[in-house]
């Protein structure tokens, strides 16, 4: 968070002019930089690699890219442990590389968003190093949540709060003199001190009641806006405002989920967080055109609109959580439309860097769920997510997973999302139908969840495996042949999913995404502002209409489609003969098979001949 001395260069390109609130119906492509494209052969994706693939992004048809963290980091949490929010990790590039990327994207009509991680810094951040080096009375400790321990000499943590990554949310500081004598703890006048970390110990939580913390983040926002950034994704947006008054409430009273709807959780979703965002919004809107931010806000649905109002947009993860059923997908659509009604926009998310791949998730049958039990009627989702994590933990052995079915359903789900009003966030590789990689060897795992929850969770590395660009090569085109091995291992058959392979196949998942995103802009974009109307909604079928075009999805069996032009289908359609008008003529009727979606422009009703009354 210390300011880098390099000034922003003058703008060298601007994206195609769009609405001042372009993000409300944009397609935003999430790039996990370390796994996208490696230009310098070090086994880690980099900014120049992304720049080299801008033509691919343009051909895909996205409106913006969102870069996950590319800042200096020890990678204790995939880059979300940030050493300096205003610089670039030298393994990924330089600020000059970043400026070239911005110019290339803008020249292609693509906007750029960057990840901001405000809840915590890394333990290598200059502030935290000073807080440790300065001893128990270091003023920098006020920038974090440092508290005395309990028990003899303060050797026990201040409370029983648990980290989201497993283990205690408190880490003890080992304060000693230069010659190694303890400054705190048993045998000294002062108790041991502990710092709070909601995530990994390498990610100490910042104290957002401190004015220096607030001002520094505003400086960071200005820094990137001045370099041409168009928007920000706010990591863990509900987390900054905290009630640290004692006594600390026991963890049994404050689970991480579900969160209370009254803002009473001491660590998450407190009303005071919106006071912080008010200053951010004022800064972002001082630019012309205005910048915006989208909140990663995993909060109760009733609390989500406040984040959209504060920042511009908030993620709705209901579609990502949904299982493959008409009930679950319909519930997700209802949630997104409710957000749109309140906020004027909504978001649709099928996957991201934190969740098992959609192609894998949708290959599970909830009937095979080992936990079983009656589903929560207020939350008819999450079974496939849970089964996928169990499957990953078992190295892809159990529970049973149908890869072919998963890919088929993921294609159908993508077409549903493309047809809905609002913004679509697309995670890199989902357009290739990439599956989760469940069997990464333990020695190659990077995610702290795998280590802090050993035996329970294997973590998120399986959705972060470097992309395949070519069918062959040392890293399937991720990096040059002869370069370093990719930072995460790619499966042997990864090349079958490669961009080069799919570009040559008009029926590939990549071709479906390209066709779908092109039609989304031309067909569904023309319907923006028009209400979504349900055509059919039951246990087998979801069908809705917007602007004279219908989106039909079958979850069960073959479904006859209405007469009209089929604009796009996730699989080849069947065809049957049906009785025509009057029962004496036959006509062909398109049939939508199970686990498939089609877009149709219905035919105009045919006028029947007037009866002869002479």
Feature annotation, model-predicted:
Residues 2-563, 570-614:
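Active-site and adjacent substrate-binding regions of carbohydrate-active enzymes
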């Amino acid at each position: 968070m210390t300011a880098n001395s390099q000034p922003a260069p003058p703008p060298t390109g601007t994206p195609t002019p769009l609405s001042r609130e372009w993000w409300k119906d944009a397609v935003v492509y999430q790039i996990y930089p370390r796994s996208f494209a490696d230009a310098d052969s070090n086994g880690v994706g980099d900014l120049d690699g992304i720049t080299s693939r801008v033509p691919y992004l343009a051909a895909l048809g996205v409106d913006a890219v969102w870069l996950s963290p590319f800042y200096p980091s020890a990678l204790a949490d995939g880059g979300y442990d940030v050493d300096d929010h205003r610089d670039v990790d030298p393994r990924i590039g330089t600020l000059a590389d970043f400026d070239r990327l911005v110019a290339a994207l803008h020249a292609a009509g693509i906007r750029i968003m960057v990840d901001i991680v405000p809840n915590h810094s890394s333990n290598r951040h200059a502030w935290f190093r000073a807080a440790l080096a300065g001893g128990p009375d270091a003023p920098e400790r006020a920038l974090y949540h440092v508290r005395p321990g309990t028990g003899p000499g303060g050797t026990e943590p201040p409370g029983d709060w648990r980290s989201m990554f497993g283990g205690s949310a408190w880490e003890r500081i080992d304060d000693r003199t230069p010659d190694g004598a303890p400054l705190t703890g048993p045998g000294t006048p002062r108790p041991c001190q502990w710092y709070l970390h909601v995530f990994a110990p390498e990610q100490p939580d910042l104290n957002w009641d401190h004015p220096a913390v607030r001002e520094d983040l505003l400086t960071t926002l200005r820094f990137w806006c001045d370099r041409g950034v168009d928007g920000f994704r706010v990591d863990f947006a509900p987390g900054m405002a905290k009630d640290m008054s004692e006594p600390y409430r026991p963890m049994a009273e404050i689970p991480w989920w579900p969160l209370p709807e009254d803002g009473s959780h001491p660590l998450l979703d407190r009303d005071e967080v919106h006071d912080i965002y008010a200053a951010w919004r004022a800064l972002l809107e001082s630019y012309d055109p205005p910048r915006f931010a989208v909140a990663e806000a995993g909060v109760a649905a009733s609390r989500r609109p406040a984040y959209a109002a504060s920042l511009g947009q908030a993620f709705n993860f209901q579609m990502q959580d949904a299982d493959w059923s008409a009930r679950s997908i319909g519930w997700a659509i209802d949630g997104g439309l409710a957000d749109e009604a309140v906020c004027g926009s909504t978001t649709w998310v099928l996957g991201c860097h934190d969740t098992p791949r959609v192609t894998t998730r949708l290959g599970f049958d909830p009937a095979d769920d080992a936990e079983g039990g009656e589903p929560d009627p207020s939350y008819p989702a999450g079974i496939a997510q849970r089964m996928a994590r169990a499957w990953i933990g078992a190295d892809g052995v159990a529970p049973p997973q149908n890869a072919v079915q998963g890919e088929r359903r993921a294609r159908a789900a993508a077409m549903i999302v493309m047809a809905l009003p609002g913004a679509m966030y697309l995670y890199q590789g989902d357009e290739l139908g990439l599956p989760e990689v469940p069997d990464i060897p333990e020695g190659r795992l990077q995610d702290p969840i795998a280590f802090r929850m050993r035996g329970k969770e294997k973590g998120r590395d399986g959705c972060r495996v470097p992309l395949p660009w070519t069918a062959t090569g040392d890293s399937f085109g991720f990096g040059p042949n002869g370069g370093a091995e990719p930072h995460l291992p790619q499966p042997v058959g990864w090349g079958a999913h490669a961009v080069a392979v799919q570009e040559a196949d008009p029926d590939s998942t990549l071709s479906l995404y390209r066709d779908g995103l092109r039609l989304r802009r031309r067909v569904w974009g023309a319907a923006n502002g028009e209400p979504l109307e349900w055509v059919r909604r039951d246990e087998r079928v979801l069908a809705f209409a917007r602007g004279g075009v219908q989106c039909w999805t079958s979850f069960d069996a073959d479904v006859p489609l209405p007469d009209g032009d089929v604009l796009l289908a996730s699989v080849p359609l069947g065809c049957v003969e049906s009785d025509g008008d009057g029962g004496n003529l036959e006509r062909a009727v398109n049939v939508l098979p199970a686990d498939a979606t089609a877009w149709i422009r219905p035919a105009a009703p045919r006028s029947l001949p007037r009866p002869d009354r002479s």
